UniProtKB/Swiss-Prot annotation:
Domain ACT: 313-394
The keyword Nucleotide-binding belongs to this UniProt entry's keyword annotation: yes
The name this protein goes by in its record: Lysine-sensitive aspartokinase 3
Positions of the UniProt region annotated as Interface: 246-449
Listed pathway(s): Amino-acid biosynthesis; L-lysine biosynthesis via DAP pathway; (S)-tetrahydrodipicolinate from L-aspartate: step 1/4
Organism of this sequence: Escherichia coli (strain K12)
Other observations noted: Aspartokinases I and II also catalyze the same reaction(s).
């Protein structure tokens, strides 16, 4: 069999009939594209998440109508809509029943079952668009191969099981024609639907590419590649034509939203290049993320992540003692929380948490039970409304004058916390949320323009 390219299209790329057709054009322009991974149509997942929270009848019917209208606007423009009308109606009926159940009692498992319907509908519609072009396209339920644990809302894939199941059930289908499947969703051992967390469709594409030994992953979104920073914050931001895995991973981890942070893990493990382009203008080019690049610059990009919380833990018991940090991290681990940045002194430790939420519902990670456990160990201070700015580069810790070049620009601003030296690829600092955009703009102007 020839090489395999996995193409993933985000919500805006399958938002309506015209967007789906543009995405179909991209798929058909490359004969090596054998597997297509889709998100739900834009807006659908947010509507489903709202339903999963349990709504009063009036609000519930309003959301259900909005979902129907988005999907039927695509369905009715098909030449032969009746071919899949019954299947779409069945999924909409499922959504209605599950939304009624959520109004009585919510649960993470119910939420995952409900929100999975967005991807199920978008993939059915996309397959029919391809078939009306006389393309041999198959719909495939990714839950047959994407085995995960039962941590609903933020499930973790079983890599070994995925590889085995993909070889048995997915690979043979790629020999028969184009396969269309869902991002974001999976299933646990008992067959219950799980999700990989918001933005997990990119991760799905990379995981499937790894399992199928693909030659490349294409991520099609609404921007033509990865930029030196968010163009909505800095209009002078420049596209990066080629970037190394390590640099892109730092950018994704610290807030650049073009790629889901976990996307690059399978790509790095299996050395699979990732291309990022715009489905609205595929000829505009994009960014290739690969193992290494020639002559990487000292400063590569700036990433911004809002809604950060700083926890400062004070305890005199830290003084000349052992095991305090182990206890703190044990508590955080029990609450499934990972720490971003950390600084310590003799009697205190400060650490940052990304509290925007990374479950399918977007719930905050900073719960009362977590704070109570920490308070039993030490005095806890919580500061919210902060933003994390990360300067991404190469060998930053070995270069002379980086501190002067960066912090000279930041003199007018209050810097709440700095992390530097643990990685040669980043210099991170925490600033008040209201200053974040100005900080990024000034740094970009001085370092990149």
């Amino acid at each position: 069999m020839s090489e395999i390219v996995v193409s993933k299209f985000g919500g805006t790329s399958v938002a309506d009939f015209d967007a789906m057709n543009r995405s179909a054009d991209i798929v058909l322009s490359d004969a090596n594209v054998r597997l297509v991974v889709l998100s739900a149509s834009a807006g659908i997942t947010n509507l489903l998440v709202a339903l999963a929270e349990g709504l009063e009848p009036g609000e519930r019917f309003e959301k259900l109508d909005a979902i129907r209208n988005i999907q039927f606007a695509i369905l009715e423009r098909l030449r032969y809509p009746n071919v899949i009308r019954e299947e779409i109606e069945r999924l909409l009926e499922n959504i209605t029943v599950l939304a009624e159940a959520a109004a009585l009692a919510t649960s993470p498992a119910l939420t995952d079952e409900l929100v999975s319907h967005g991807e199920l509908m978008s993939t059915l519609l996309f397959v029919e668009i391809l078939r009306e072009r006389d393309v041999q396209a198959q719909w495939f339920d990714v839950r047959k191969v994407m085995r995960t644990n039962d941590r609903f809302g933020r499930a973790e894939p079983d890599i070994a099981a995925l590889a085995e199941l993909a070889a048995l059930q997915l690979l043979p289908r790629l020999n028969e024609g184009l396969v269309i499947t869902q991002g974001f969703i999976g299933s646990e051992n008992k067959g219950r639907t799980t999700t990989l967390g918001r933005g997990g469709s990119d991760y799905t594409a990379a995981l499937l590419a790894e399992a199928l030994h693909a030659s490349r992953v294409d991520i099609w979104t609404d921007v033509p590649g990865i930029y030196t920073t968010d163009p909505r914050v800095v209009s002078a931001a420049k596209r990066i034509d080629e970037i190394a895995f390590a640099e892109a991973a730092e950018m994704a981890t610290f807030g650049a939203k073009v790629l889901h942070p976990a996307t690059l893990l399978p790509a790095v493990r299996s050395d699979i290049p990732v291309f990022v382009g715009s489905s609205k203008d595929p000829r505009a080019g994009g960014t290739l993320v690969c193992n290494k690049t020639e002559n990487p610059p000292l400063f590569r990009a700036l990433a911004l992540r809002r809604n950060q919380t700083l926890l400062t833990l004070h305890s005199l018991n830290m003084l000349h003692s052992r095991g305090f940090l182990a206890e703190v991290f044990g508590i955080l681990a029990r609450h499934n929380i990972s720490v971003d940045l950390i600084t310590t002194s003799e009697v205190s430790v400060a650490l940052t948490l990304d509290t925007t939420g990374s479950t399918s519902t977007g719930d905050t990670l900073l719960t009362q039970s977590l704070l109570m456990e920490l308070s039993a160990l030490c005095r806890v201070e919580v500061e919210e409304g902060l933003a994390l700015v990360a300067l991404i580069g190469n060998d930053l810790s070995k270069a002379c004058g980086v501190g002067k070049e960066v912090f000279g620009v930041l003199e007018p601003f209050n810097i709440r916390m700095i992390c530097y030296g643990a990685s040669s690829h980043n210099l991170c600092f925490l600033v008040p949320g209201e200053d974040a955009e100005q900080v990024v703009q000034k740094l970009h102007s001085n370092l990149f323009e």
